[in-house]
Amino acid sequence: MSPSSSGSGTSRSLTSNKVNSTETVSAPVLAMKPTQIAPSQSIQTSVSIEDIQARAQLRKKLREARRGLTNQQHTDAAKRIASRLRTLPFLDNSTTIAGYLVNDGEVNLTYFIESIWQSSHDKKFALPVLHPVCKGHLLFLSYTQHSQLVKNKYNIEEPVLSCKNVVPVRQCDVILMPLVGFDVNGNRLGMGGGYYDRTLSFTQRAPDSHSFSGSKAPKLVGIAHDIQEVDALPVAPWDVPLDAIVTPSRTLQFTKP
């Protein structure tokens, strides 16, 4: 089954079931608080007014550009990126992959997700949900053809909260991240909420790209249309750098310091 050709909506052709209310979350999930951000990495870290304004203006311009793509351009981008993702060695060797559901003109990952479901029985796919306890953080839940979905406060579909479906972020081998803008240095401009930066702050503190538990930190892969590239992004102290960026025309990989 093919995904919706438009990248600007949340409609999909998957067999997931939509629901209108959220399942009651039991104590184990509510108690799972993510690692706290150190003061030097706090989202409240000071940045100049000029940088804040520049990021806001750039975000507005790039969001308008990607929403302006035609349905055919969105479909072509989704197919090409799905093909490119399947060639990434570290993704092919992974067992748990996290992604996202399309919103606001983002690249649609449905082609890739369905290919994982159909051909890779040893791989688990996960989606982010707004954390029910820690404001501004994400929680990851497993996602299958039969997952029930509900729209969050941003009108984005996400799996219904359930303890048994929680996937700890440190168990994710790869996280495919939406973005608003990027540059060739691996910097990412998001929607401005800071959800990914807070949730993934531990990847910046992990020595030798490893988390404190000794397991490898997840590979962070930005997914974007080519028109979302800029010469140089204004970088904030809390921004989490990417390991790779995949667009319809190329794949960029980076070495973190």
Question: Which residues does each predicted region cover?
Answer:
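Conserved phosphate- and dinucleotide-binding cores of soluble alpha/beta proteins
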Residues: 24, 30, 35, 45, ...
